[in-house]
Every structure is written in structure tokens, then in C-alpha cells.
Curated annotation (Swiss-Prot):
GO terms for molecular function: citrate (Si)-synthase activity. This is Citrate synthase-like protein clz17. GO terms for cellular component: mitochondrial matrix. Keywords: Transferase. It comes from the Eukaryota. Pfam families: Citrate_synt.
Amino acid sequence: MATVNGAVGKPQHISKMIESTKMNGNQAQDAAGRADTPVSSDTPDYLHVFDSRTCNIHHIPVSDGFVRGSDLSTIAAPVKGNSGRMQKLAVLDPGFQHTACKESGITFIDGEKGELRYRGVRIEDLFHDHDFDSTLHLLLWGRLPTNDEKIAFERRIFEAATPPQEVCDVIRKLPKNTDFISMFLTGLSTYMGADEEMTRSRHQAVMTYHKNMKATDDAIIRCFAYVSATLATVYCHVKGVELHPPKEGLTLVENFLHMIGMEDPDKKVSRTIDRLSINMADHELSCSTAAFLHVASSLTDPMTCLLTAISAASGPLHGGALEVCYQGLELIGSVENVPAYIAAVKAKKFRLFGYGHRVYKTQDPRAALTKELMEEHREAIAANPLLQIAVEIDRQANTDPYFVERKLKLNADFYGCFVYIAL
């Protein structure tokens, strides 16, 4: 007779377990029919799994719509050809499509409805009513800052935003036509080498950041400054212009523009970059986030984790999709070539970057916000000859059964490239 081996309770005969399940269900129905007997919402849920290899049934606890891998590993069966050895069940899930490596309250996405929230705040509200600095504060500490907190936060970033001479020197030694990501990572690595605390943390027995939230928060804030300052240094090197020192009293984006010498009297450019940055600030367990967390599990410093995340984000199926999407439009060449290109995509000869998403089964909510930015920069974007190609692709893909049936919709990358170029 088969038995039940579960994460909770002792093994039972199948017949007893089924009878028990029926009784519990009947009792719940009876209770629901009596107004004076509330049905407890704390009753645990279980996933009942029948293992045909052993004829055992396992009951796995279900909490908030997920099961724990450690509970699944209680399921085991004899190794073929070696009946004395048991092998625990493992889960193969390429791409983490159905797997979460940790619980988080940072970002929530409903891919069916097209909803995105940071710490419970709608992306649309952050986009329209807040700037990137406030969004960073929200992501880091779980709440939007007061005015005084925001000023203090920006001051701490400013204090770390002057690049050391060695950072400037190493970037300036690179040819100006060097790949951007290569220059960016080189500069950040040098910046990290100049941060004595981060460098020391990898060579001492007492963990600098483990269970030390103040040190961790301080290091993360320095990372914000390092990223902005390195971007400015790389930009100035490539363009052959002077790098200006940071200025107190400016936001992160405003200081970046100040450092590269860009005049922005009406703040139109800084506000656009702010909102583009809010759009891309976080997206649950993305490839780069997973890479960051893998490295962080070794208890290394935040910048080492960030370098790994940036490397992951540079790929064409992640952050690099923005550039590849634009190059794809250049490859098409003209509106007349769009039907042939769409046909090639459906024949799986080409990938249509900017369309479809692993999470969203309707329009990416960030895409609608990007269109708002396009409207603000309409004149500059309309002058781009590739825009009409993009519009025609969007029109055809929106009505073609191939895309409609597969729920392939516009994502944030498709039109985002036009806004960056317009700036």
C-alpha cells in the first residue's frame, strides 16, 4: 500500500489521506453555511503530488502562490540501477521563468494587466509626480523621502561624485572609439579600487557589510555617485570636452549634465532622463538582478555586485536591446521593406527587438510612458527617418494574427531609443 510522505505530518495510507481531505472539505462547507461559524483564512494549502516512481503521495505546503524548493526536495526515489541510493527531486527551470530565488517587496508586476509598482507605488505616479532621486530612495528604503531627507540623500551622493584622478587617467588612456560598456566598466573598476573600504572588505575576517545595514547603505549611495561620475567622465573623453566638478544642490541627473557641461535652463533634458531612469529603475528578478544577487551571496562589496549586474545588462536580450532595436530599424532601411521583415520574423529568420516581453502579455506599461516623452520631443524625433519604419512595424504587428495570438506587444525598448537620440 502506498504511503504519503510530506513536508508536514507523518506518512499516511492513501485512502486515509483522501478521506481526511474530503472530511476537511465538508467541514469547511458546513462552517461556511453557518453565519456564526467563521471560516479560518489561516487554513494551510497543500499541493498533493503523486510520485509514480515510488507510488508515494507527498503534500507540499503552498504559501502565497508558491512552494519552497526545500519542500520539493523531500521527494526522493531510488537511483536507477542502484536501489540502495535515493536521489532528491530537483527543479530545472532555464531562465528562472517559474522560479524566485528570494522573497521581495520591492517590485510588483502583473504581466496580464500590464501593471508595474515600486514598493506599492504605481510606475505612472512616480513617472509623473517624482524624480529619479526620490525613486532611488523609495527602492532603497521602502518609502518616498521628505524634502529634508531628499536634500540629505543628494548631498551624500554629491560628496562621493568627484572622480579620483586615477579614474580620469585610465579612461583617457582608452581610444575614443572603445566600446562604451568596456570604458564604463573600466572606469567603475578603477573607482572601486580607490574606495579603501570596499577594497579592504574582501581581505578581512570580519565581514564589512554582512548584517551591517549602515555600512551597506553608505556603500550603495557611493555606488550611485560612482556610476554617475564615471558616465560623465566617459562622455567627456569621447566627446573631447572638459569634465566639470560636481555641484552641490543638484539632483543626480542634474549633476551629471552639469559635469558634462550641458546647459539645461528649463530642465527639459534632466526631467526626460529622470523619467527614462524611473522607467528602468527595477524590474523584479531580471537577468542583471539575478546576477547581482548571486554575487552578493558571497558577501562581497556592493560595487563588485553592481559591476556584475552591469555586465549582465549589457547583453542584447537585456539592457543592450535598446541599441540593437535601433540597429534593426537601420537594417530594414525603409517603410517599403517592413512587410518582408515582418515575414522574416514570423519565419524565425530574424528577431524583432522591442516587441514581446517575457513577463508582459499585454502592452508594457513603460511603453505608454515612453510615448509621452516622445510627444514632448516630437520635433526632434519626427526628424529621425527611422521613426516611420518603427511606426509601420508597430501598426502591422498590432494587427497581425501571429503577434496578436502570441500576445506579443510593444515593450519599453521599441520607442525608447528615439528619445535617447533626440536628447
